[in-house]
């Protein structure tokens, strides 16, 4: 079966033919590639084509596809059972592994997705502060729960629907939206609203393209939250263990009240988490009145994969230096080639995360990101795919470097960039 036929058949049985909108490739006027398998830095589609994969399952695969250590851990766990709906030692082991590196985090709760993690963190913040409103930032994406699907990035931005049908006005009105990297917009909202339970932010935004928050902005944001008895939530579902081993904390050293984790923490399996100090976490059921649960939360296969992934990342002290150097080489190379061709391009990286925009002006917020030439992006994406490079099919997503990549792979990618630019 070909990719084309597979998508046609999928559309008969699956809404939109995919189980997450951006996978449909609709924004780049194309059809999705159906993947048969992956190995290291590469994925292979059912037509027999191979691609250097810079999506890496949208971030979880720090060690690439089919990493032997993670596979071995999963196989060992599976041999004992796939799910119990009861506590296992693996949950405590992964909890200790995460908390040992964050001095301000004392307890953690595992869930199955980033959406669950942020949704639960919001409920927890409201329960702790006894306040109703939340503040988020335009273009930041925190999953598809109703209160957070307002002025969102990621797939919502990709399909030009930053909010969603079905989100009730009564819910949306309790979500305040500020401008990313603009502290004055935050101050204005706090002046008008005294009942803000929490501020949630991607400290390294990866869902409007890659746009890191400025250090002074985050420092001032933390002060405002503290002065107003408002909890600060860092959504590190994407940046955790990606931007650095300690995520944004390893870069900006700001201690958020609650941190959400995902992607890498599950080693490629469905796992996420939220963590905070004990006085906050202890109001979760069964100790307190904030309810959260999940049949597959703490699934043993996901816990085993997470332990293997984080243990390996922690042991390889030079891993993040290597990934950062490769990302820097890629983004600087793309910028140089674009300049030579006379194309407007902004490119940056934070650790193993990278992003690029087809615009002449620097990008520091969602409105800047929207200035990117989407037609140019679509042509570039199509050309790169034809040259064997698999990039996210959306201008408003982030790319990822994995440990199986090297200088040769980056050189091959940059040659594909050169050829792709020639055809634009």
Regions found by a protein language model. Give the residues of each.
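Conserved N-terminal phosphate-binding loop of PLP-dependent enzymes in the Aspartate aminotransferase
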Residues: 1-424
